[in-house]
Amino acid sequence: MVFLGVTMAAGLLVGRGPVPKVMAVADMEGYETLKVFTEVLSLVQKNYVEDVKTKEIVYGAIRGMLNTLDPHSAFMKPEQYKEMQVETKGEFGGIGIQIGIKDAMLTVIAPLEGTPADKAGIRAGDKVVKVDGKSTKDMTLTEAVEKMRGPKGTQVTLTILRDEFAAPKDFTITRDIIKIQSVRHKDLGDGVGYIRITQFQERTSEDLAKAIAKMKEAKVTALVLDLRNNPGGLLNQAVEAADFFLPPKKLVVYIKGRRGDKDEFFTREEETFQGIPIVVLVNEGSASASEIVAGALQDWGRAVVMGTQTFGKGSVQTVLPLTDGSGIRLTTAKYYTPKGRSIQNTGIAPDILVDAEGREPEIAAPVDRPREKDLDRHLPNDQAADKEPAIKDLKKDQPAKKTEPRRPGDSPRDDPQLKRAVDLLKSWRVFRNLPPTSQANPPPATP
């Protein structure tokens, strides 16, 4: 199993073929290091002032080992590993927020819509300084997620630091069963359909097929595919989603590991929406698997990508089970769009740059929201600077906006970005129906 999503309280996975076997350490340096580890473990067991639990010490060492790597590699205790497997089905107990580490602080990337955290007023960019009174300083993402999760009806208190607060403020949130509805759809009228994918779970492609069937029943002639605030998910589901919008045998994405091995993923089925114009909406919260879909449609010229620069997570995590029921999530590869672009740290640059208020770059200002490049220990982009996609962050010379980013709405009336997308599709249809210049009647002469 492979991850293609931002580390978060909800948990996101990506699947890819069989899990590789864990190889034994084969070099002398590795053996010598293990000898030092066992020596320290023995000294602690024999000489520490109080009795110690060996398993907890070993787990702590493994956790520390993975914490020296990138921000998406992590250790999972047996109970965490089991819960991770449940998460891919889209249902778990918790408060519903995406979190990451920014500037050595636990930071909210985004609350999931309609969840307890969202209803309590938690915002993207909030700094979580305490969980149930315990400082988050030096707390790993795995530990933070574990503390925030729990049975329905129980409470957790997050101490939040926000620019507008004079001092940190406590938010007491009642946990609930978080059921992630990964696909939503709506007929916007005038032949324009709307499909939103909130994340890529086990059943996303099935739900997407149902949504597309509804759109075809409505006889839509243009489509908005909304991937805003989609933090990623299962790789196979991202590929299957792209399958609906591209012809067969088209490359969707390829991934490469340290040894240069390359896996390619192609579309298989006939395109469902052949010939109709598509606008893909993205923003700073669009990460990983959602960036794969947006990048594939952009590279093949199948859709216009509109919105703001995406998150920029271009790495792949493999989930490796351990013998005692625990597991590790290890970054094993990077992924590339069909044209060979790595979006690690850079993200997908939209074709049409429009901020959450519907404004274009001349008058827009950036939203202060963490991206991959802001996370501690993030991996570099391995492409030469002259080959990297242009980073079109809005108004770099202006201070970032401290207000909460606007949430996607289901209607163009309360969602300026969606309104811009709908307007573009309508104008597209008008221009497409114009007769060729040679056939058009000239304007009447003015006497």
Residue positions per predicted region:
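Extended, small/polar residue-biased N-terminal targeting/export presequences
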Residues: 48-109, 153-172, 178-185, 419-425, ...
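Glycine-biased strand-turn-strand hairpin within the trypsin-fold
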Residues: 22-49, 53, 57, 67-96, ...
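Short acidic, Pro/Gly- and aromatic-enriched capping/linker segments at domain boundaries
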Residues: 322-333
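Conserved functional hotspot residues or short segments at active or partner-binding sites
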Residues: 334, 339-447
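Hydrophobic membrane-insertion alpha-helices, especially the h-region
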Residues: 1-14
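Cleft-lining beta-strand/loop regions that shape enzyme active-site pockets
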Residues: 18-33, 37-54, 85, 107-111, ...
